[in-house]
């Protein structure tokens, strides 16, 4: 009897190819939503968005496209507990936007708390990169927690740090109360990290195990067998 082959961990370069990445991008958003939903206090919702409208300081509407977002809605208090351990970040880098804090006008039913974005090739090249950078800077100034998941080795990264450049895969969490982003770096063949998804204080972060999410996608899509 042959020995069972251990599954490959971490991101696979094949998944960056145009043949595979669009499906990966869509499916990971869904997997992340399904993971986070039952772990949220009941007064939060998470949805996959095609666009996002916010009011800037002049009252004009800005339209952006995060991948997933978490909103808070009013409801009675709910208990929350989670025993999954979040890994410490690899290091921290300064936020290049240096956001200035100001009051934002928000609808009571649309209090944006967190965005989670899996970067696509369009986020890392040309005008797409510039638009992504400006969008993230605007959201940071609006007091939104930003989670960025970069599973692409090609293209520009908005975090200007040599350690970021040396990593093949990078996940960052920029909290609304900080100008320093926590960074989780991974190389080819390394498991993706478990990261915190921040909520509004005093609510606890939701641990997000990216390696588990990726492996679930590979198993459900049948790609786990093809990539071994």
Residue ranges and their predicted role:
Residues 1-228:
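Gly/Pro/Ser/Thr-rich low-complexity, intrinsically disordered segments predominantly at protein N-termini
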């Amino acid at each position: 009897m042959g020995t069972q082959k251990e599954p490959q961990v971490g991101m696979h370069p094949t998944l960056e190819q145009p043949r595979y990445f669009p499906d990966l991008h869509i499916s990971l958003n869904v997997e992340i939503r399904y993971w986070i939903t039952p772990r949220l206090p009941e007064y939060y919702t998470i949805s996959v968005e095609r666009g996002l409208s916010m009011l800037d300081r002049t009252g004009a509407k800005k339209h952006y496209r995060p991948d997933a977002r978490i909103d808070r809605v009013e409801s009675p208090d709910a208990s929350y507990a989670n025993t999954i351990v979040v890994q410490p970040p690899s290091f921290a880098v300064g936020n290049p936007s240096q956001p200035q804090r100001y009051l934002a006008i928000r609808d009571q039913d649309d209090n944006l708390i967190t965005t989670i974005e899996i970067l696509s090739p369009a986020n890392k090249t040309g005008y797409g990169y510039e638009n992504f950078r400006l969008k993230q800077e605007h959201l940071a100034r609006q007091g939104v927690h930003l989670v960025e998941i970069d599973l692409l080795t090609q293209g520009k990264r908005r975090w200007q740090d040599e350690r970021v450049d040396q990593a093949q895969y990078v996940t960052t969490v920029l909290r609304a109360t900080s100008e320093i982003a926590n960074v989780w770096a991974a190389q080819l063949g390394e498991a993706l990290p478990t990261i915190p998804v921040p909520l509004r204080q005093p609510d606890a972060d939701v641990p997000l195990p990216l390696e588990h999410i990726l492996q679930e996608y590979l198993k459900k899509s049948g790609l786990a067998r093809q990539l071994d």
